[in-house]
Amino acid sequence: MGNCLSSSDQKEAKDRSVAIDKQIEQDSRQFKKECKILLLGSGESGKSTIVKQMKIIHQNGYSKDELLLYRLTVIKNLVDSAQAIVLALRKFKMEPEMPENRENVDVILQYRVDADPGATLDHPMARKVDSLWKDPIIPAIMERSSEFYLMDSAAYFFDNVNRIGQADYVPDENDVLRARSKTTGISETRFNMGQLSIHLFDVGGQRSERKKWIHCFEAVTSIIFCVALSEYDQVLLEESGQNRMAESLVLFESVVNSRWFLRTSVILFLNKIDIFKQKIPKQPLSKYFPEYSGGPDINKAAKYILWRFTQTNRARLSIYPHLTQATDTSNIRLVFAAVKETILTNALKDSGIL
């Protein structure tokens, strides 16, 4: 049979075919670019700090007005930490060695932070906190920090108390990364990472928030699960008798074996490696996990904790571990370069290309 189409018809058909192919390719590329990442982990594991790092790295950081929004949180964190030290001194029947600090502890304990977002820290109070932090008794109380609740950033804020106590104090990005407030509900952060458009969902880590999670996120590309390595000797804020690492293991087990995530990969951030390195020589891991036999070796201790987490993976999900320090922007930038490859691979698998 002869060709019934004219050359103009053939050209039109070819152009239409090319346009359709181009649209299919564009749709496919768009599909691959949209990646939903679920950020999970127990309270104070570093999830919100990761979100802040994404803003710094991928969204041009914080404006002055945005930084000022954190001033009240920083001041509250500082005062709460100072009061925690005073209460610990009383709990352990210890007293400051410097006479002025013996007088200051009551004033510190009674101090209340003004709830006004524009409030500042009284300069005399800043001096009292600074004096207490420099008291010779403090190293002895910090040796026992696993026996009472003290936020990880306490020492950082104490070291910067005179700057924070200035009337014109504006937090910097390091302050923001260390500022701690409870995350409730679900927040979404969107940013581009190379050819990927990331939708990062941060879920409240405290126990009362967990029931809100899982059913919403069946279609996520990957889960980033944060574990604070340094919590192996700490107790829960919500339940003071419960070991925080044990709680994280229970949560991780429930996530990796959930029917909602059977095709999801898990990126495991073993976070707060900096605090972990300082702590392991002073607080033996074997005291809290008796079967550990690697002594004060940092690598062996981290590998043991990783092993404990991977042992819970009965669903045989792909797990990609990374040692992280969420407060260190350069570290998180490097880690996310590797994470990007993992996410891209999983997106390609989801789209049927791999």
Swiss-Prot record:
Residues 324-329 are annotated as: G5 motif. Keywords: GTP-binding, Lipoprotein, Magnesium, Metal-binding, Myristate, Nucleotide-binding, Palmitate, Transducer. The keyword Ribonucleoprotein does not apply. Residues 36-49 are annotated as: G1 motif. The keyword GTP-binding applies. Residues 198-207 are annotated as: G3 motif. A lipid is attached at C4 (S-palmitoyl cysteine). GO terms for molecular function: G protein-coupled receptor binding; G-protein beta/gamma-subunit complex binding; GTP binding; GTPase activity; metal ion binding. Signal peptide: none annotated. It comes from the Eukaryota. A lipid is attached at G2 (N-myristoyl glycine). GO terms for cellular component: cytoplasm; heterotrimeric G-protein complex. Residues 267-274 are annotated as: G4 motif. Residues 33-354 form the G-alpha domain. GO terms for biological process: adenylate cyclase-activating G protein-coupled receptor signaling pathway. SUPFAM superfamilies: P-loop containing nucleoside triphosphate hydrolases (SSF52540), Transducin (alpha subunit), insertion domain (SSF47895). Pfam families: G-alpha. Residues 175-183 are annotated as: G2 motif. Mg(2+) binds at S48, T183. GTP binds at residues 41-48, 177-183, 202-206, 271-274, 326. Guanine nucleotide-binding proteins (G proteins) are involved as modulators or transducers in various transmembrane signaling systems. This subunit is involved in cAMP regulation and morphogenesis. It is essential for dimorphic switching in haploid cells. Belongs to the G-alpha family. G proteins are composed of 3 units; alpha, beta and gamma. The alpha chain contains the guanine nucleotide binding site. PANTHER family: GTP-BINDING PROTEIN ALPHA SUBUNIT, GUANINE NUCLEOTIDE-BINDING PROTEIN ALPHA-2 SUBUNIT. This is Guanine nucleotide-binding protein alpha-3 subunit. The gene is FIL1.
